[in-house]
A protein has these predicted regions:
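Secretory targeting and sorting signals
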Residues: 1-33
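Non-catalytic cap/lid and distal C-terminal segments of serine-dependent acyl enzymes
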Residues: 28-298
Length: 298
């Protein structure tokens, strides 16, 4: 069983470390010389086909979820995050959906075109099981920024599908009063999106239903392997972070405390002074966690 490792860093701040029915289009692409397929996976929930970069390698897969400014056709994990180079040849498959910009990869109450939780937790794994021979469950979800939130939420609420969750600069406490205001402001500023259409106005209380911090006990009870990385440096890709890197940093630390308080012991938490909230650092972290992912799901 994987234990919990601790690392204390003092570099101006203290950093704690605890050691997602149709025919696919077989378009071939390359990322760092690793060939992948672009699958068009039908989503009945969203009423359209979703482009998914797929690299076969085993029955269990890593689902890679993009930051807020996700590209419409090819995941930024493929074009900027070197996902295929980092994960190819390790005995696991790679699944990277595109088109999830400004969505938090959740089911929106007032926008039928954004039903990402249904797609990632049901439609996509079922389609991959039927068409690519993947296992129905036992996968990993890893994401940056909004994708970090979604990875943790998918693992918390769909443990039959996901046994590993990785969050890089993720918003892990969205129902926090300061955080929900920041998310709403950032969605409007960078995406022109009214975030109240997601889970309703924050004061109505439904944001808590979807919150990994509030439901951290589920991750602890299921012994889900978690990896959380968030730097103290506020620099990086502003659009990818909707200008709210500080909220992600604070959220990750509060999530760590909550996870520990409910008995969580199967996590890696790292809050370094180095790195930033952008693809150079996120790509490096994906490579760093690759062995951990393989050990958890292969």
């Amino acid at each position: 069983m994987r234990g919990l490792s601790m690392l204390l860093r003092v570099l101006c701040v203290a950093a704690l470390t605890l050691a997602f029915g149709g025919v696919a289009a077989g378009i071939m692409g390359k990322a760092e010389a690793a060939p992948y397929e672009t699958l068009m996976v039908p989503s009945g929930a969203m009423g359209r086909d979703i482009p998914v970069a797929f690299l076969g390698g085993g029955p269990h897969a890593v689902y890679l979820l993009d930051a807020f400014n996700a590209a419409p056709d090819v995941s930024n994990w493929v074009t900027a995050g070197n996902a295929m180079g980092a994960l190819g040849g390790k005995g696991i498959s790679v699944v990277a959906p595109a088109g999830g910009a400004w969505s938090m990869y959740t089911n929106w109450e007032q926008d039928g075109s954004k039903q990402w939780d249904t797609f990632l937790s049901s439609e996509l794994p079922d389609w991959l099981a039927a068409n690519k021979g993947l296992a129905p469950g036992g996968h990993a979800a890893v994401g940056a920024s909004q994708g970090g939130y979604a990875a943790m939420a998918l693992a918390a609420f769909h443990p039959d599908r996901f046994g590993f969750a990785g969050s890089l600069s993720g918003f892990l406490y969205p129902s926090n009063t300061t955080t929900n205001g920041s998310i709403l402001a950032g969605l409007q500023q960078f995406g022109g999106v009214d975030g109240n259409g997601m889970w309703g106005a924050p004061q109505l209380g439904r944001w808590k239903w979807h919150d990994p911090y509030v439901h951290a006990a589920l991750l602890a009870q299921n012994n889900t392997r978690v990896w959380v990385w968030s730097p103290t440096n506020m620099g990086g890709d502003a659009a990818a972070m909707i200008g709210q890197a500080g909220e992600a940093m604070g959220n990750s630390r509060m999530f760590y405390q909550q996870y520990r308080s409910v008995g969580g012991h199967n996590g890696h938490f790292d809050f370094p002074a180095g790195g930033d909230n952008g693809w150079g650092s996120w790509s490096g972290q994906l490579g760093a966690m690759s062995g951990d992912i393989v050990g958890a799901i292969r």
